[in-house]
């Protein structure tokens, strides 16, 4: 299976005063052969961030090669009919390059309150929304009467270019999230996990899919991986630690990120590959003004190691 590496600017690299930064971000991806560009989702908050669906329409226009996706979209806060229309439009105009990844949203109840949605029901809302969106993409006339959403004899156009429908990736590192992927998802995009946790979660995904008579592609296991490249490993760890958005109390952040020299980062990515992951979304653990340089280094020194399947990635990483 081939490995694909995409990138997300992260909470500290989504621009600011210069709207042209998004064009520059796309140019980095095209210049260095990244597979895809992803944007995170925050509806309210003081931290500067773009609305991802709107911003990704610009990405689709700036590049005719890059795939693009949400990493990840807080699905319970969206109307699934409107979102299905938005994603179908993006996918149609980009000729099948849209990769929707969704999740339950943040633990902070502020966004749920602001959007008029109960946090208590977010898991059930997500499951129902995924089923409804997929029907709207695949069927001409849809009637749905569920616990949270209702529509009668509706259709959306255009239909997505990606047939039968864009794959819906689901985030979350819990057992419940892995089981949700198996029940209703098409892929797992997980963050803040160790390679061993990827291996165990992957087993849960495929076991749950089998229980529900579903098939998930072997290469639809992905990792959102924080990283920082530096020849000085100790300084890299000290710097990157300040930019870990949601540190885990039970695991040091270095166990579920890639921080240090090029060889170390390549080895860490290979550990995830060995655990069954083939898709990666890398995020620089650094200030926004340094993010572009880090993405360029990753694109120059790491991406070619994994996007060229004919040569061992470890052999190439160890070359002087």
Model regions and ranges:
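N-terminal beta1-alpha1-beta2 module of alpha/beta enzyme domains
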Residues: 1-62, 164-166, 285-288, 313-319
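Hydrophobic faces of well-ordered beta-strands that scaffold small-molecule active sites
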Residues: 5-9, 37-39, 68-70, 98-102, ...
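An alpha-helical appendage that flanks or caps ligand/catalytic pockets
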Residues: 1, 115, 119-160, 192-279, ...
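Flexible, glycine-rich active-site loops centered on histidine and acidic residues
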Residues: 2-17, 77-143, 191, 196-199, ...
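Active-site mouth loops of central-metabolism enzymes
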Residues: 7-19, 73-80, 162-173, 252-263
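Short, acidic/polar
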Residues: 17-29, 86, 170-180, 261-271
């Amino acid at each position: 299976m081939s490995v694909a590496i995409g990138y997300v600017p992260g909470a500290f690299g989504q621009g600011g005063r210069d709207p042209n930064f998004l064009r520059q971000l796309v140019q980095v991806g095209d210049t260095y052969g990244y597979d895809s560009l992803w944007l995170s989702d925050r509806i309210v908050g003081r931290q500067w961030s773009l609305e991802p669906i709107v911003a990704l329409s610009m990405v689709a226009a700036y590049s005719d090669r890059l795939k693009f996706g949400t990493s990840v979209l807080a699905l319970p806060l969206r109307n699934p009919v409107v979102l299905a229309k938005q994603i179908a439009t993006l996918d149609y105009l980009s000729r099948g390059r849209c990769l929707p990844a969704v999740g339950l949203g943040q633990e902070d109840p502020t966004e749920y309150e602001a959007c008029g949605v109960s946090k208590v029901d977010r898991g059930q809302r997500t499951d129902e929304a995924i089923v409804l969106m997929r029907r709207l993409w695949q069927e001409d006339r849809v009637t749905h009467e569920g616990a949270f959403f209702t529509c009668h004899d509706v259709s959306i156009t255009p239909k997505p270019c990606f047939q039968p429908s864009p794959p819906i990736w689901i985030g979350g590192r819990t057992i419940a999230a892995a089981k949700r992927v198996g029940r209703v998802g098409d892929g797992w995009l997980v963050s803040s996990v160790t390679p061993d946790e990827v291996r165990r979660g992957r087993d849960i995904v495929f076991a749950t899919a089998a229980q529900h008579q579903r098939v998930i592609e072997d290469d639809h296991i992905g990792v959102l991986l924080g990283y920082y490249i530096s020849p000085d490993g100790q300084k890299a760890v000290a710097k990157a630690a300040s930019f870990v958005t949601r540190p885990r109390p039970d695991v040091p952040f270095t166990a579920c990120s890639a921080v240090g020299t090029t060889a170390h980062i390549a080895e860490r990515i290979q550990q995830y590959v060995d655990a069954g992951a083939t898709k990666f979304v890398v995020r620089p653990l650094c200030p926004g003004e340094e993010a572009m340089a880090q993405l360029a280094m990753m694109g120059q020194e790491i991406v070619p190691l994994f996007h060229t399947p004919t040569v061992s990635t470890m052999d190439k990483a160890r070359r002087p």
